[in-house]
């Protein structure tokens, strides 16, 4: 993962607001199964990038682990954490279950819960490093 750039810490200018809203999400598949491996993990990453681009969000860090996903993303001030998760999880579930029939064995792809924490610009680099280090554990 690339290091945090100065652009990641810049304020977002929208028509009615100036903001710097970085959210750290952790979300897991149903029953915490080791689902995110190989081609499935690669495709999940592509889907997340598509959703982020379509919604004009910015990925700061993304790590897809076999049992969970870390996503550090800059969002618009009009988008809530629940909206971000709904977009990511629903698109991923729909596409992945069509493209990988083995995932149909799971009653649902995601747990309904997730973790989200807001990240200030001072600690964003720390959170990004933490996410990257998860791969080595």
Task: Label every model-predicted segment.
Residues 1-137:
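Basic nucleic-acid-binding interfaces
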């Amino acid at each position: 993962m690339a290091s945090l750039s100065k652009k990641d810490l810049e304020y977002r200018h929208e028509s009615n607001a100036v903001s710097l809203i970085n959210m750290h999400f952790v979300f897991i598949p149903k029953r915490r199964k080791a689902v995110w491996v190989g081609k499935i993990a690669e495709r999940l990453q592509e889907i997340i990038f598509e959703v982020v681009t379509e919604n004009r969000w910015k990925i700061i860090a993304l790590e897809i682990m076999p049992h969970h996903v870390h996503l550090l993303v800059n969002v618009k001030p009009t988008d809530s954490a629940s909206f971000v998760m709904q977009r990511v999880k629903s698109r991923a579930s729909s596409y992945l279950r069509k493209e990988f029939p083995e995932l149909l064995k799971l009653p649902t792809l995601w747990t309904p819960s997730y973790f989200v924490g807001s990240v200030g610009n001072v600690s964003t680099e720390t959170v990004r490093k933490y996410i990257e280090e998860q791969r080595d554990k």
